[in-house]
Amino acid sequence: MTEKISKCGVVAVLGAPNAGKSTLVNQLVGQKVAITSAKAQTTRARMLGIALHESDDAKTQMILVDTPGIFAPRRRLDRAMVSAAWEGAESADAVLLLVDPVKQRRHELEPLLESLKDRPERKILVLNKVDVAKKEPLLALAQDLSQKVDFAEIYFVSALTGDGVPEMKNALAALMPEGVWHYPEDQVSDASERLLATEITREQLYQQLHEELPYDSAVRPEQYKQRPDGSLEIHQQIVIARESQRPIVLGKGGSRIKAIGEAARKDLSEILGVTVHLFLHVKVDEKWAENKEVFEEIGLDWVR
């Protein structure tokens, strides 16, 4: 029996905020490795999802770089997020531009298209939400964007339902170069369990508080230790910028933070495969977004 070729390559997933990048990465990997939210700019740092593909002649490992959404930066944190996004595209074997044709305004894509058009990487256009978008406007948008950037391929998918994703995954695997795998077969992300735990809690903050809580919040790790019975004890700090936000996070009688903790604990237990004891508390720090330690904790470079 002929031994299968080993292939390994990098795919950067770019797009405007809230285009569905993290949802698509989770679909390609086959499980949650990136947090998702209806709130834009949920992803803050580059995170790698690791997807596997096997064909008749090859076994392929695709390293998916889930990047922060690219937008006009205003704060130091914004600048670091946009910088991380473009760094994620460097040296990639393919760059996916994911576009939400339902919510995305055409003019919002212009700076991204302008920056992308002269880049040397193989560029692929992915139009999301085919499950809800109308066909004719979708095709017209694809043609319009292709006139701006020389896309090698165009795919129509639904990151939410998975429609069109297997076909795109097959095509991406075919593009990857021959080479040894960079990660063990059972590894699905480069994120440490400690970072993943803070990301899962942050996802619940966004999902449960919706528009009530602005972006000036973070989740910081405090303790992460294994108990004698094999379970994990995790302590985290929810950092907010103003005292007036504390009751929003806590809820009446502590009901909101309890619900956030319960949902995050359940997700973590399922992902890590062990019982998790999660303890959350709230801290007010008006200048947390200027704290170098916070940047390091969430995997962002400190930028001026």
Swiss-Prot record:
Region (G1): 15-22
Topology with respect to the bilayer: Peripheral membrane protein
A Pfam family matched in the record: MMR_HSR1
Segments for region (G4): 128-131
GO annotations of cellular component type: cytosol; plasma membrane
UniProt-annotated binding residues for GTP: 15-22, 66-70, 128-131
Main location: cytoplasm
SUPFAM superfamilies recorded: P-loop containing nucleoside triphosphate hydrolases, Prokaryotic type KH domain (KH-domain type II)
A GO MF label: ribosomal small subunit binding
UniProt keyword terms in alphabetical order: Cell inner membrane, Cell membrane, Cytoplasm, GTP-binding, Membrane, Nucleotide-binding, Ribosome biogenesis, RNA-binding, rRNA-binding
Superkingdom as given in the UniProt entry: Bacteria
Family: Belongs to the TRAFAC class TrmE-Era-EngA-EngB-Septin-like GTPase superfamily. Era GTPase family.
Subunit record text: Monomer.
Annotated protein name in UniProt: GTPase Era
Record organism: Erythrobacter litoralis (strain HTCC2594)
Name of the gene: era
